[in-house]
Amino acid sequence: VTISGGEMLSRPDFVTALVEEAAQREISVCLDTSGFGDGDILKKLASMDNVTDILFDMKAIDDEIHHRYTGQSNQLILENLRQLSSDAAIRSKIQMRMPLISGINDGWEIIKQTAEFYQENKLQRVSLLPYHSLGISKKNHIGGHQEEFCQPDDVYVEKIKRYFEEEAVMTVEIQGKV
């Protein structure tokens, strides 16, 4: 079972009950989170034996960029990730997920800072998620507004992949290529 959302930590009582019930039924759980929520609850959930995977979204290491595009500081997120990664058993479950949006969070300094953070916290796996515009027409159809973003160049995404592999010594995959 994958528990996602919005943000799964926005419903901590429900998510905790669900993971506990899944444990009683010997059902494996994957947590899909941005890490924005109560760190103690996140660590409790992450340490449960039936939680086998944690997909952790890192939208931007730069707090100003993160705040501009999400409306929130990333300090709580980074602290929660530090706490999770300080436990080797939990750390082994973490798969970082990094959306790449051209001109927003894919600048070389941001990539280097992100790789350093991952390395400092001994994180081993990252999925790069190049932005694509699929879904824009649906959002426009239902009356939503979407800021125009650009898809990163495939060659540049490969360069980022190699950098994470070589400098941060991570296993890297590129997902969602269109």
Q: Model regions: which residues?
A:
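Conserved AdoMet/S-adenosylmethionine-binding subsite of the radical SAM
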Residues: 2-5, 9-129, 134
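Auxiliary Fe-S-binding modules of radical SAM enzymes
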Residues: 100-178
